[in-house]
């Protein structure tokens, strides 16, 4: 088990309100290519109780039931551990959720999104806990899925960027990516994510820097928020006893200017929620200027500016974007110790394209078969249904 506590520094489980026993909540899943949809599910689950335990499946279990994961189990454990609503991570959690698992970790109930998760033989992985009344459901986040993100990487288009309409070519490709012939699965495909102020409020901490805290500014694309970013932010967090980290996220067009191709894979709104979900980040500047200016440093009362070991690309006029913090002597480059980059993730997907398409087709076929069986069961007269006597 990996215990997180409620803050980045860790801590013990606290009693519930009024001194009552804390309500312990269980979630589990693959958590492959973790995005803000996963984070939102865990946020909702945490709100249903006082202490959230998240079980993460092994590579072997995922390959058996779904197909090869994009990230290794160690990478996935660390990504889930970095989500601020998670109190504890259980590595190598069983793929099928049982009462035995809930009892082992003293959990009152488990929470899952309102989509379906099936075993290799097409059975609902939550069947046992549902029958026992120890299952709760939360809303699935519309407009994002791992399938959609993989589709964006494979189809080199900028249609997903902010302020751009989704092209008919992109929509057709994303809707059909990995689908079995004739598939009409309500949980697969793509829809545009609609950002709202309420969603940002739900993800944000809402805390201002306090006296004695060190305000640290970092900036970048933070695209496909991944282990490399987490390792960097964790190292930055350790630079001060009481850090307050502000992450500046560049506009999509700015990122595309210095990254090229169809980057960023996730648009500014999506990247904002992904970064806000990280336990090491206190605040996000949405659409930060590429150059870290004197005005920005003064406005946020920045004590320290950090950048990773990746190349610092000059601004459009050829100037160093970190010229001002360097002049003030408050600039530091941090080695995250990770070699994972957004480019490497995209390369993994491209290299294993056929495997991922086959995986999604297999998943789609199982889910459609389950839906059809449920429809037929519901259409039968009561006395003829399985289990009715």
Curated annotation (Swiss-Prot):
The UniProt record lists the keyword Membrane: no
EC main group: transferase
EC number, UniProt record: 2.7.7.14
Chain residue ranges for the region called Disordered: 1-20
Binding residues annotated for CTP, in chain numbering: 221-222, 229-232, 259, 307-310, 336-340
Modified sites of kind Phosphothreonine: 341-342
Disease: Spastic paraplegia 82, autosomal recessive: A form of spastic paraplegia, a neurodegenerative disorder characterized by a slow, gradual, progressive weakness and spasticity of the lower limbs. Rate of progression and the severity of symptoms are quite variable. Initial symptoms may include difficulty with balance, weakness and stiffness in the legs, muscle spasms, and dragging the toes when walking. In some forms of the disorder, bladder symptoms (such as incontinence) may appear, or the weakness and stiffness may spread to other parts of the body.
CDD domains: CCT, ECT
Molecular function, one GO term: ethanolamine-phosphate cytidylyltransferase activity
Enzymatic reactions: phosphoethanolamine + CTP + H(+) = CDP-ethanolamine + diphosphate
Tissue: Strongest expression in liver, heart, and skeletal muscle.
Gene3D superfamilies from the UniProt entry: HUPs
Gene name of the encoded protein: PCYT2
Family matches, as InterPro entries: CCT, Cyt_trans-like, Ect1/PCYT2, Rossmann-like_a/b/a_fold
Keywords noted in UniProt: Disease variant, Hereditary spastic paraplegia, Lipid biosynthesis, Lipid metabolism, Neurodegeneration, Nucleotidyltransferase, Phospholipid biosynthesis, Phospholipid metabolism, Phosphoprotein, Transferase
GO CC annotation terms, alphabetical: cytoplasm; endoplasmic reticulum membrane
Record-level GO BP terms: phosphatidylethanolamine biosynthetic process; phospholipid biosynthetic process
SUPFAM superfamilies: Nucleotidylyl transferase
Modification type Phosphoserine: residues: 338
The protein's name: Ethanolamine-phosphate cytidylyltransferase
Functional summary from the UniProt entry: Ethanolamine-phosphate cytidylyltransferase that catalyzes the second step in the synthesis of phosphatidylethanolamine (PE) from ethanolamine via the CDP-ethanolamine pathway. Phosphatidylethanolamine is a dominant inner-leaflet phospholipid in cell membranes, where it plays a role in membrane function by structurally stabilizing membrane-anchored proteins, and participates in important cellular processes such as cell division, cell fusion, blood coagulation, and apoptosis.
Pathway given in the UniProt record: Phospholipid metabolism; phosphatidylethanolamine biosynthesis; phosphatidylethanolamine from ethanolamine: step 2/3
Transmembrane intervals: none
UniProt xrefs under NCBIfam families: cyt_tran_rel
Similarity remark: Belongs to the cytidylyltransferase family.
